[in-house]
Amino acid sequence: MRARDVTVASVRARIVVQVSKRRLTFFRRGRRVLTTTVAVGSSATPTPTGSYYVNQRLIPSDSGGPFGPGAIGISAYSNVLTGWTQGGPIAIHGTNEPWSIGRAVSNGCIRVRNPVLRKLFASTPAGTPVVILR
C-alpha cells in the first residue's frame, strides 16, 4: 500500500458506555453532548467491555421492529453467542421495548430510546471510537 493511496481522517466524536451504570455518554470535540440511560446485556449474555469503533449502520425495513429506527454496528462481538455470525456482532440500537431501558436484558447490545438513536446515527461516522467500561 502506498501512502498516496490512503486518506487519513480524524474523528471528533466518541461514545462511552458504562455498563454498571447503564449509561451512554456521547462526546463531540471533547465536550459532553448527550448522556442517556441504556439497556445492556443480561448476566447470561453480557455486553463486552473494551475499546471498539463504529463499523456499520443499519436501517431496518420495519422501524417498529426490535432495532427501532436503526442500529449502529460496532466492532465488538459477543463471547457468549457463538451461534451468530462470528460470535454475535454488538450494536447500539433503538428498541420496540422502551420499558427495557435501564435494565440488563439484552443479548449484549446497547439499547437506547429511539430519539437518542436518531441523534447518534446522525453524529457517529464510521471509525467513531466506542469505549465500553464495566
Q: Residue spans of the language-model regions?
A:
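Gly/Thr-rich phosphate-binding beta-strand-loop-beta motif of the actin/hexokinase/Hsp70
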Residues: 24
